[in-house]
Amino acid sequence: MMKIKIIFSYDGSAFLGSATQPHKKGVQDVLSEALSHLGIFSPLLMASRTDKGVHASYAVASVECGDHFVNLEYLQKQLNKFSHPFIHIKKIEKVKDDFEVRFDVKSREYRYIFSHSSYSPFMASYVYFYPKFDLGKANELLGFFVGKKDLKFFCKSGGDNKTTLREIFIARAYAYKDFSIFHFKANGFLRGQIRLSVASVLKVLEGKMSEKELKEQIEAKKQCNHFLAPPNGLYLSRICY
């Protein structure tokens, strides 16, 4: 047996989440079924979990398979055949037997995409349509998140985290064409953390929440915002080992 790392992307609007779901509507379910068509029945392990409607341009999974799969490019081609059209396998690599796809991760990155153009139903599942805002101010507010923080008030219930401490390496906003993008990089994320963070920054920009309240929530003093930004604008964009 050998262990392989699968790098892939997926359209989150087609799934109930990335993890195994009832009625097999999770990304993990579809990818596991595709592997079974190729005679690979070992448990598929995922590096990250995303909620319903959240996308991934760069996700990672691992699985054990027979040593006879020596042509990984052929395996990639066949796996794409069975996971099409909402999952795309970008690369398959052989890894060491002790590789831990989840616990060996050094950092994860997410991007949240806003569109400031006219509403289009064809884009509605992939961006958050939102009026233009002060990008400089957004950058300033996002900067409050950088560093080692106890983000217990930026966490949905139901997570399996042993601690709510996280180190945020990057939290910034930038423009690309008619889009504004929030970029987050950290050693790990809590369930719902980014969507709660995005919604909190937007509330300050809208004047519905003060900077002081945002800082108090980041400093784990009190929760001032309970609302989450919609999932459709969020993308898992990088996982580093």
Curated annotation (Swiss-Prot):
Binding site for substrate: 110
EC number: 5.4.99.12
The entry's keywords: Isomerase, tRNA processing
SUPFAM superfamilies for the chain: Pseudouridine synthase (SSF55120)
Transmembrane annotation, as ranges: none
Residues annotated as the enzyme's active site: 51
GO terms for MF: RNA binding; tRNA pseudouridine(38-40) synthase activity
GO biological process, any: tRNA pseudouridine synthesis
Source organism, top-level taxon: Bacteria
Catalytic reaction annotation: uridine(38/39/40) in tRNA = pseudouridine(38/39/40) in tRNA
Signal peptide region: none
Any Pfam family matching the protein: PseudoU_synth_1
NCBIfam families: hisT_truA
Function: Formation of pseudouridine at positions 38, 39 and 40 in the anticodon stem and loop of transfer RNAs.
The protein's assembly and partners: Homodimer.
Family, similarity comment: Belongs to the tRNA pseudouridine synthase TruA family.
PANTHER family hit by this protein: PSEUDOURIDYLATE SYNTHASE, TRNA PSEUDOURIDINE SYNTHASE-LIKE 1
Protein name: tRNA pseudouridine synthase A
Gene label: truA
